[in-house]
Design a protein with these regions (language model features):
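Post-signal peptide N-terminal segment of mature Sec-exported envelope proteins
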Residues: 36-71
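Bacterial signal peptide processing site
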Residues: 29-32
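Bacterial N-terminal signal peptides that target proteins for export
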Residues: 2-15
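C-terminal motif of bacterial Sec signal peptides marking the signal peptidase cleavage site
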Residues: 24-27
Length: 315
């Protein structure tokens, strides 16, 4: 989940999930916010609520996470036709007929990874690469000087990171090691466009390019595929370093055309939309989906908190 700069008419959310039939719209029921145009306040409120719930859950006994031995499969080569499911909270529904599952690096149980592996699914592991989250097990490794402004001014639990910091980068290397050990096929590093926000550090487009390329290089060095999360202003510059993209709300904010730099190279673009109209109005959703398919996007309409309360697929 990424919170875009106030100066831009765009919001995203990554910390904020039956089978798909080709060219059909599928749903699994449930409800979400009644807000049609998903505002920055709506996105931030959902993100904060999910983060606070994760924070409370982390106070209890923490299960030991074991390394998951991958099955003897060929390495994942992302394809533009790959379909996906994205669920970062709640009990993970492993029953979708998709190519890729995008789940939380820290919170997803071993049993879920094992089930997905047994089904031949590809696993992308989500973590925030641009913010400190005070419920994560490695949180205390961040220095005070690494942490900047709050992502949500009303909540202390998550702060922007100084991505120039050697300490921050070492922590991210360790997270990539964890992803490798857990048997993830790829990673989704979130909050990688801090320079468009107010992080509390003099981060620039250049420092962001450097950090994002660092993440991609380190992921690939471990045999992991790596996805570019949002950062729509740097798509062309970063495409060569990344294997796929994850986007929020590019259909709502007319930002999808830039992803042709990925799809033209056969790289998948996994897109999530949160607009109430596309949840509730099948005709409006069909129109949006037709445009998304024409651009070779793999689009889902999902709840803000990514808990699988409902799911509509454009594939």
């Amino acid at each position: 989940m990424t919170i875009r700069s106030i100066s831009r008419p765009r919001v995203s959310l990554a910390c904020l999930g039956v089978a798909s039939v080709s060219l059909a719209l599928t749903a699994c029921g449930g409800g979400d916010s009644d807000v049609d145009e998903v505002s920055r306040a709506d996105v931030m409120a959902a993100r904060t609520a999910r983060a606070q719930a994760a924070n409370e859950a982390a106070k209890g006994p923490r299960a030991t996470i074991q390394a998951v031995q991958p099955l003897a499969t060929t390495p994942w080569v992302p394809q533009v036709t790959d379909t996906w499911q994205w669920q970062l909270s709640g009990t993970i529904n492993t029953k979708y007929n998709v190519t890729v599952y995008d789940i939380d690096l820290f919170d997803a149980p071993d049993s879920v990874l094992a089930t997905l592996r047994s089904q031949g699914k590809r696993i992308v592991c989500y973590f925030s690469a641009g913010s400190s989250e005070d419920w994560r097990p490695d949180y205390k490794q961040f220095k005070a000087s690494d942490k900047g402004n709050r992502l949500d001014p009303q909540w202390e639990g998550e702060r922007w990171l100084d991505t120039r910091s050697a300490n921050v980068r070492n922590i991210m290397k360790a997270r990539l090691d964890k992803a490798k050990a857990r048997g993830c096929d790829g990673v989704e590093p979130d909050n990688v466009d801090a320079y468009t926000n107010k992080p509390g550090f003099p981060l620039t487009a250049s420092t962001q390019l450097d950090y994002n390329r660092f993440l991609a290089t380190e992921a690939r060095a471990r045999g992991l595929k790596v996805g570019l999360k949002n950062d729509v202003d740097q798509l062309k510059a970063l495409e060569p370093s990344f294997d796929f993209a994850v986007n929020e709300q590019c259909n709502q904010y007319s930002e999808c055309s830039g992803y042709s730099v990925f799809t033209s190279k056969g790289k998948p673009v996994f897109n999530a939309e949160y607009k109430k109209l596309w949840r509730d109005d099948a005709n409006a959703r069909a129109q949006m989906c037709a445009k998304a398919r024409a651009m070779n996007l793999r689009t889902l309409v999902l709840p803000l908190n990514l808990n699988d309360a409902f799911r509509y697929s454009c594939d």
